[in-house]
Design a protein with these regions (language model features):
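A short glycine/serine-rich beta->alpha loop
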Residues: 10-15, 118-130, 223-227, 282-287, ...
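Glycine-rich, N-terminal phosphate-binding loop and its surrounding beta-alpha-beta segment
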Residues: 43-103, 107-109
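Short acidic, glycine/tyrosine-flanked loop/strand segments centered on an H-E-D-like triad
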Residues: 98-124, 316-332
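Glycine-rich, mobile lid/loop segments that gate access to catalytic sites or pores
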Residues: 113-226
Length: 358
């Protein structure tokens, strides 16, 4: 089923944007791991809306209620289930949209797939709201990985045409690792922040939206993790990335840029650092043959512009069979790239932990 994923670490998500709650069930966690709930809360706040004028004013407490699998501060080893209540919904904003298909959304595809029984309010089960559950699960997986010496970090690589530097070219410093989570727009080159803010606010002023890219790195991962072909590190992470609404592309290392290189440029020269084998460059993103080589796993994800915009758009009324003009009301993000970072990190943590445990 589409709501389930995993081999050793199995997750199952449920709920709709305007339902009573959303939630997740996590199976396969080892017993006795102490979960820092403050760290979980910090991750949830990074994804939550309403932090500034760069995101939707819709505010949700996003406080997970753990129902099972957690006792006296530690995992029990049985399925860990949690829900997150939906407290700030305006379903009336969607009453007129039952038959009018919103461009860029899954209204039409969901209606067809579920024979018109889908909950269309706020996108229902297709909503980015559901990613709050993924962030909760990922926050736990991140803590387990950190106990193994593995850290996952990310930054905004681009907003529109404004580009930040890359993890492939810049050393990921302890200063960045310790501070990026507290920033609304985590960047390597902080001089780009003002231009990115202006780009987002310009899209908002024009009743439009804008997309961008996020670059993610897995640090401290040992060589030999993963499998060739169908269960490769790339296919595992790509599977999870494309489960995030708005993700439309992924590339590992230099990705598509490799197509413009010669083999002598693309190949990462190897050398010894003590007993470790490292590479002088990381063009392949720390993965060869679907298996980690000991270098940081680095990949970039493309986030499309928010589909809900206040500009008029041409669409269809599926009930009357007529073409019509859609004018959307409600509370929407001019850009979701900055809110996608913790979701991408969370999905990465789930995938990497599953690969290690499996």
């Amino acid at each position: 089923m589409s709501g389930m994923w995993g081999n050793k670490i199995k997750i199952s998500i449920f709920g709709e944007s305007h339902g009573n709650a959303i939630g997740i069930n996590i199976d396969g966690l080892e017993p006795g791991f102490e979960i820092n709930l403050d760290k979980v809360s910090s991750e949830m706040k990074r994804r939550a809306p309403g932090r500034s004028n760069l995101s939707t004013p819709r505010k949700e407490a996003d406080e997970p209620e753990i129902l099972s699998g957690f006792f006296q501060g530690k995992t029990t080893g049985t399925p860990l289930c949690a829900i997150i209540r939906n407290n700030n919904t305006k379903s009336k904003d969607y009453g007129k949209l039952k038959d009018i298909m919103r461009p860029g959304h899954a209204d039409y595809t969901g209606k067809i797939r579920y024979n018109d029984f889908n909950d269309y309010r706020g996108g229902g089960h297709f909503s980015g709201r559901i990613t709050a559950s993924i962030v909760f699960a990922g926050a736990i997986c991140k803590q387990i990985l950190e106990a193994k010496g593995i850290k996952i970090v990310s930054h905004i690589k681009s907003i529109g045409t404004i580009e930040d530097k890359s993890f492939l070219d810049e050393k990921i410093t302890e200063g960045f690792i310790n501070s990026y989570m507290s920033k609304e727009l985590p960047l390597i080159d902080e001089l780009k922040e003002e231009a990115m803010r202006k780009e987002i606010l310009l899209a908002k002023e024009e009743l439009d939206s804008i997309g961008g890219t996020v670059e993610c790195a897995v640090l401290g991962i040992e060589p030999g993790i993963g499998n060739p072909f169908f269960d490769s590190v790339e296919s595992t992470l790509a599977h999870l990335m494309f489960s995030i609404p708005a993700v439309k592309g992924i590339e590992f290392g230099r990705g598509f840029e490799l197509t413009q290189m010669r083999g002598s440029q693309a190949n990462d020269s190897m050398y010894f650092s003590g007993e470790k084998v490292l590479t002088k460059t990381n063009n392949n993103g720390g993965i060869l043959g679907g298996i980690t080589n000991g270098m940081p796993v680095i990949f970039k994800v493309a986030i499309k512009p928010t589909s809900s915009i206040l500009k008029s758009q041409n669409t269809v009324n599926i009930n009357t069979g007529e073409e019509t003009v859609l004018e959307v009301n409600g509370r929407h993000d001019p850009c979701i790239v900055q809110r996608a970072l913790p979701v991408i990190e969370a999905a990465t943590a789930i995938g990497i932990l599953d690969l290690i445990e499996n």
